[in-house]
């Protein structure tokens, strides 16, 4: 009130969180508004943070998610630009390529899309164990891992990043009317990256910011 500045808290959906997908976030906010005597204050001061990595793992397109939240009067407080790691699994040797990212430090929620549908695991270690036990079922499957590889990274096939989610999100924001959300680069895995992906920290951060500025 003294400064006239609007303060908002952005809640961040994440796989295996209290709510983690587009519809779950909408149900959560509808529940808050329905129970509140002042729902307009919720809409003014409470909103969501959108992480491109999280929704790449959930396989929900940026335009679908961001449009749905907008249509339901949920404030978009912040957008976090981050990559997920993607891999096409053709055999056990591809699982071995992913083992280097099972660092034991962070949780790396993993989704597997195969011919029977999609599966979600709380950590890469769980997904790798499943892959070893059910090698035939996961043949020719697509894996997406909550592992924030640098925005500028171009891993060797069959590994790749989900940078198309960053590009689609950026394009959506450019066409969006009204106040824009706070933008943030969300890579935090510098200390646990495989050695061949590491460069000096200041150079890594500078390259990421340059990547966003030149989208």
Regions found by a protein language model. Give the residues of each.
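Active-site acidic/histidine proton-transfer and metal-coordination neighborhood
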Residues: 1-47, 57
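Aromatic-rich peripheral "rim/lid" segments of glycoside hydrolase catalytic domains that contact
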Residues: 189-215
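Short glycine-centered, acidic/aromatic-flanked micro-motifs in structured strand/loop junctions
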Residues: 11-15, 50-52, 149, 187
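Acidic carboxylate-rich catalytic motifs and surrounding loops in phosphoryl-/glycosyl-chemistry enzymes
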Residues: 9-12, 82-84, 185-188
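Conserved active-site loop/cleft motifs that coordinate metal ions or position small ligands
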Residues: 146, 180-187
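Alpha-helix N-cap and loop-to-helix initiation/capping positions
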Residues: 16-24, 160-165, 197-207
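Active-site capping/gating regions of soluble enzymes
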Residues: 26-30, 39-178, 196
């Amino acid at each position: 009130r003294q400064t006239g500045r609007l303060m908002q808290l952005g809640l961040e959906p994440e796989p295996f969180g209290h709510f983690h997908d587009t519809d779950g976030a909408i149900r959560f906010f509808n529940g808050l508004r329905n129970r509140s005597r002042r729902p307009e204050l919720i809409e003014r001061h409470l909103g969501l943070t959108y992480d491109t990595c999280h929704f790449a793992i959930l396989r929900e397109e940026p335009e679908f998610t961001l449009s749905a939240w907008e249509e339901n009067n949920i404030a978009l407080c912040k957008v976090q630009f981050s990559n997920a790691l993607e891999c096409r699994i053709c055999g056990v040797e591809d699982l071995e390529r992913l083992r280097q990212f099972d660092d034991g430090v962070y949780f790396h929620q993993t989704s597997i899309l195969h011919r029977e549908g999609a599966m979600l695991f709380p950590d890469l270690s769980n997904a790798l164990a499943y892959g070893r036990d059910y090698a035939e079922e996961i043949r020719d499957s697509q894996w997406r891992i909550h592992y924030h590889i640098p925005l500028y990274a171009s891993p060797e096939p069959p590994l790749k990043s989900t940078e198309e989610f960053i590009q689609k999100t950026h394009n959506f924001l450019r066409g969006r009317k009204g106040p824009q959300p706070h933008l943030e680069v969300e890579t935090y895995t510098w200390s646990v990256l495989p050695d061949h992906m590491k460069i000096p920290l200041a150079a890594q951060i500078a390259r990421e910011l340059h990547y966003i500025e030149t989208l």
